[in-house]
């Protein structure tokens, strides 16, 4: 497991060795630790703007003892067949899940780029900039990735944050759906059905998604 301090130390060390400035987006447990939702995580999930940035990041972590691992026991089969699955790098109990441009079918939306929770900068000769996503994006992406403990993390976020913006989440899911993400609608509907077993979520939010799904299925007939 990776603690918040482990993560900070790693990013500082990486920032000092970069040969170019790199900006990436932190999601999942990485972003949750910045919120204080959890004290440790199994992996550091990062989304890069382009392949050269990811390649430079990988070059650095390989000098630190990380080696490429297999995602086949981490993600379900459907996700593993996607060409946008992550490259995974491991060292003892630490793991990086490194995506480029999109997380499976989910792309970087205008809101993801502009509306962030926090920005962290790690400076050496060059700079590593890590932008932490706001909580609504974290929940959506955990619905999409469907890894072990992802739903537990969603439950933790919703229970701890009384100001969770459900409409913001729904709007982003619908935007992703309209812009080509063929999974996000069903994944979020599935998550909401499961979530309603544990806590109250207004029915209207689920209806906004199932209504869109119904229109999509009607068009196919």
Give the residues covered by each predicted segment.
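Compositionally biased terminal segments of proteins
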Residues: 1-221
